[in-house]
Each structure stands twice: as structure tokens, then as C-alpha cells.
Amino acid sequence: MPRPSEPSPYVEFDRSQWRSLRMSTPLKLSEDELVRLRGMGEKLDLLEVEEVYLPLARLIHLQVAARQRLFATTAEFLGEPQQNPDRPVPFIIGVAGSVAVGKSTTARVLQALLARWEHHPRVDLVTTDGFLYPNAELARRNLMHRKGFPESYNRRALMRFVTAVKSGADEAAAPVYSHLLYDIVPGEYQIVRHPDILILEGLNVLQTGPALMVSDLFDFSVYVDARIEDIEQWYISRFLTMRSTAFADPASHFHSYSTLTDEQAVFAARDIWHSINRPNLIENILPTRPRATLVLRKDADHSINRLRLRKL
């Protein structure tokens, strides 16, 4: 529980303390399902789901119910009709963190667990990759070397999308990004129709600014954290694996990397990390960590053993 030191807006837990907060929340995820959710190079197992993600899912479940009661109270005060129980105000969750830290896996596991509660079965997951400017526009703006940095996103379009979902629009459309093509897919959209919960996953979702930002619309947020040196190693390992998987596809934007030797691939991955991903992490992503409701801290083996929950 809280360390007896200086006052902090957080409560810190080790894994043994956190897992006790699961209470009687049942595990409704099979090993086969977990394999499909697990990211490349990650070692997430059902024990970690039980000890880390089930307590988190329980906390979010409780907060969803509390938030709906708050909306009902506000509606009563304003003399407005009570909301349709089949169309609750969507609960928005942000999931942030570096490239290769495992935030996509965290988002997918949360989606799977939260959708198993009968009170909020409609859980949509959207990544901010779809709101990157198309490559042609990035090239026009001389931003191809800054892809993934805040300025490479159409932040107005992202804000319109999240606002539409939050305000109860019948449907909202998110552009689709192809990692194979390394570009937006023209004319293809992910349609979100009044979900109970929307999970928005991306590098910079917790950013702030002088104007309204998507993070201002979040009801809960998670930052997936690790030592920068560990994330670099995970990125390089993933890059090496992708030579024989995603990069091997002739249609891949990075197909030329598939023929690199181990030494060449490590050199290329390290160069990309130090020229793009590490600066983006240090300058833009890491500074948003204090805004997260919950920080999941990973060890070098990808396991989560420390957590920090914001209480204020």
C-alpha cells in the first residue's frame, strides 16, 4: 500500500497486493483466446491475467457503474429524462505507452475481459494509428521522419471522432491504418455504434494542450511503462522476428528488411529506435505518464509486477 514517504496522488502496489483486489471476479478467458490476444514477443499468461488484469477489469467495471450513476444524477438535477439503459453514455478508456511496450496487448486483453460483463457487453477498441495523416500528406508536410510524433496525427479528426462517440452519436467512423502498407487504407473505416465502453489505444493519447484534447474526455486511462533500455531491446527483438513474418510479405512496405542479416537488422532497428522512437518517447510520451489513472510497470521479461493507481 502507500509508502510512508512524501504525500503522493498515487497508491503504489506490488503484484501480490494488487492481486488481492480481484475479489471473486471470475476468469472467463481461455488459453486459446489469450494466444490470439498476446502481442509479438510477449509472455503474458493466464496467471498474469488473473493477478493483474482481473483486478483492473473489476476496478473499471465499478467505475463504469459509478459514472452512469453520476450521469443519472446530473440528468435528474437538470430535469432531463433519464437516459435509455440500452444507450448509456459511453465510458472512454485511454491506453498509452511507447512503441513495443505492449500497450496493444493491454488494450486487447481489457476489451476481452470487460466485454464479458453483462452490464457493458459492447466494448470497442480503436487505435490512433488510423488518425495518422496519409503518407502523401506527411510527405507534403515534410513529416515522414516524424511519423508517430504528435504533429503527424490529424488531431482534429481524432477529437471529432471521440466527441461523437461520447455524445451518443448513432455511429462514428475511424479511418483504418495498414501496418502492412504503412499507410491509411483509402475509403476503409472502422464503424463504432454507441458502445458501452470505448478503448482508445495510442502513443500520444494522454497529451494535453491549450485546447480541448481527447484525454479530457477519458473516464479512465492506463499507461504501460518500462525501462527505456528494456523497451529498446523489445523493439529490436520484434524487428528481428518481423523479418520472417510481416516483412516477408512482398506487399509489405518494409519488405526490403526481410533479407537483412541479424547484424544488419539489429543495426537498422537500433537506428530507427534512436532516431524516431526513443526521442518521441522521451519528448512526448513519457511526460504524459503522470496523467494516467493507472501505471502498469513492466520488468525486463515483460511481466507486470508494480502498479501505481491515482487516488486524487
UniProtKB/Swiss-Prot annotation:
Residue numbers binding ATP: G97, S98, V99, A100, V101, G102, K103, S104
EC number: 2.7.1.33
InterPro entries linked to this entry: P-loop_NTPase, PanK, PRK/URK
Main EC class the enzyme belongs to: transferase
Catalytic activity: (R)-pantothenate + ATP = (R)-4'-phosphopantothenate + ADP + H(+)
Pathway info: Cofactor biosynthesis; coenzyme A biosynthesis; CoA from (R)-pantothenate: step 1/5
GO CC annotations on file: cytoplasm
Keyword vocabulary terms for this entry: ATP-binding, Coenzyme A biosynthesis, Cytoplasm, Kinase, Nucleotide-binding, Transferase
GO biological process, one term: coenzyme A biosynthetic process
Annotated TM spans: none
A Pfam family recorded for this sequence: PRK
Keyword Transferase appears in the UniProt entry: yes
PANTHER family reported for this sequence: URIDINE KINASE
HAMAP family in the cross-refs: Pantothen_kinase_1 (MF_00215)
Protein name: Pantothenate kinase
